[in-house]
Amino acid sequence: MQLTALEIIRRESLQKLRELGINPYPAKEFKTTATIDEILTNFKKFEGKEVILAGRMMSRRVMGKASFSELKDASGRMQIYINRDELCETDDKTMYNSVFKKLLDMGDIIGVKGEVFKTKVGETSINLKELTLLSKSLRPLPVVKTDAEGNVHDAFSDAEQRYRQRYVDLIVNDHVKETFIKRTKITNAIREFFNSRGYLEVETPILQPIPGGAAAKPFITHHNALDIPLYLRIANELYLKRLIVGGFDAVYEFSKDFRNEGMDRTHNPEFTVMELYVAYKDYNWMMKMTEDLLEKVAKDSNGTTEVQIGENKVSFKAPYPRVPILEAIKTHTGFDVSGMNETELREVCEKVGIEVDETMGIGKMIDELFGEKCEHTYIQPTFITDYPKEMSPLTKEHRSNPALTERFELMVNGKELANAYSELNDPIDQKERFEEQLKLSEKGDDEAMFIDQDFIRALEYGMPPTSGIGIGIDRLVMFMTNSSSIQDVLFFPQMKPEKKAPSVELNDNEKALLKIIETNSPILLNDLKAH
């Protein structure tokens, strides 16, 4: 273990605190009476009154017998004024001269008791009367500075380091915490919208014997007791439909899904999807519901239906345009691909510069055409509708064109945000669609769907006409917070393995420090330096 000079000094301070009889990690509950935000927003209510706060010490300015510090709790930051003789009313000034001035460090978690007042310059502050150490910080925090123009410069701006050590990122970068607070507002808004309509929130299995409901590569594991392979779910769709078969009229779930595929700025192998299924509805009804839902989410999280996403101002105000996918492809490529066979589609793909191979069927090639040539052009919310049957094995056949299905995807800022259907409830048709997927799998398509015989059995008992939708929560949060990477809206995104420093032989100084930690024995910093 290699320690920096500052880390060694902090460990020495830890020992000195213990020698003074101060437990740096007390177990007893510390009862607070207010938060910083409550005091700042209701100063008149708290003025002149005694309060108890707890938080992290973020700065310290020592000015002889008086000092200033900044305390940060979960709600905000506030100045603490420390007068030596008010903190230490007896002749013993240890708490000020030794503990506060020398042994406490930036990042330490403390409890403070004092009166609320305003300084001569009008800053709301606490006049400290009692100080309690609640947790000693052994690593120094990165230093964050604001220049004269108000620009923030911090020593913790490396993206990879921020994602790995999100706990530090949250401490020093207040705007990061705001992103995750807004994420909760977004999911709360969705829950309120559904719960007000009587929809039931449910939970379905994460470990599944068959990974169904989407075209994606699953993660595979093994159950030792049952001696069977299991898969981390790629979607929860088929289980939610089983609940519709069972008699629920409307169910939804915020599900953690997993896909063993690539990682980029919009994809993480573990992600959150909200799926909703409502009986006796179709995809036209679902489009209207989606517009109403996203209007509410935008207003609740941003106070307006207009949201800045990168360079674009996007309006979530209904209604949204509806564009059939084959019309979109014709508009952006000049080719009418409706009715084309595999050979003809392959020729079109080659003409527009899209690589194809023999494993790709009609659905896959149409998906590639739209994704490469059309998707990025839809900045404002747009429903792309009426997908070919080959692309949608779980979707009901279109009521006026048997070659198409009643499916839509919602595009926002050039990306897919939601996917929805009039759900296929014909068990015979569903079995045939699964068998077509099996043929694609045999051709080498590793994203083709598995055949789920139990789901077919459930449909044979009868599922009412149903519409369902899946909304990518991580991507929705990216849009509503104007975040450019999915890693910015996940507390702990998946990362490549951290590079470890090469192992080194401990020197005498480090061995002595290791002994302190292992035996909890006191040793002076000067003794360490003597080594």
Predicted regions and their residues:
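Short capping segments at the starts of secondary-structure elements
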Residues: 518-524
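Alpha-helix N-cap/N′ positions at the starts of helices
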Residues: 9, 508-512, 523
